[in-house]
């Protein structure tokens, strides 16, 4: 039986300022038996989060657990906003979605 997984990434936790790390998360039950990756501006950044290097000098890194996989943007800057991101799992992929200011920052009280 063939079925398609509907992928949609979310911001895992909003930040308070530029310069912090921001994680985008693509929820998948029983992750990650298939390659799980990320695209930024239609460019492949991570082919598979399980094998991607987590070198602290690299702007991005990948995470995964049984509930899904993540994309960490280190040292968030304005250049990371208003561009499209999408996740891919096996042959399924999310629709490219813009990362907007309101998605990223916690509202000040």
Q: Could you describe each region identified by the protein language model?
A:
Residues 1-12:
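N-terminal Sec-dependent signal peptide, specifically the hydrophobic helical h-region
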Residues 15, 21, 31, 43, ...:
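Disulfide-stabilized cysteine-rich extracellular repeat microdomains
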Residues 16-25, 64-68, 74-87:
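Solvent-exposed loop/turn motifs of extracellular immunoglobulin-like beta-sandwich domains
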Residues 76-79, 84-109:
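Extracellular/luminal immunoglobulin-like beta-sandwich modules
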């Amino acid at each position: 039986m063939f079925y398609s997984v509907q992928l949609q990434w979310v911001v895992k936790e909003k930040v308070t300022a530029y310069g912090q790390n921001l994680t985008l998360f693509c929820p998948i039950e029983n992750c990650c038996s298939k390659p799980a990756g990320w695209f930024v501006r239609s460019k492949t950044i991570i082919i598979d989060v399980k094998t991607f290097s987590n070198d602290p000098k690299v702007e991005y890194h990948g995470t995964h657990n049984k509930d899904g996989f993540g994309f960490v943007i280190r040292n968030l800057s304005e250049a990371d906003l208003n561009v499209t991101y999408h996740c891919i799992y096996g042959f399924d992929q999310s629709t490219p979605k813009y990362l907007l200011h309101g998605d990223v920052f916690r509202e000040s009280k």
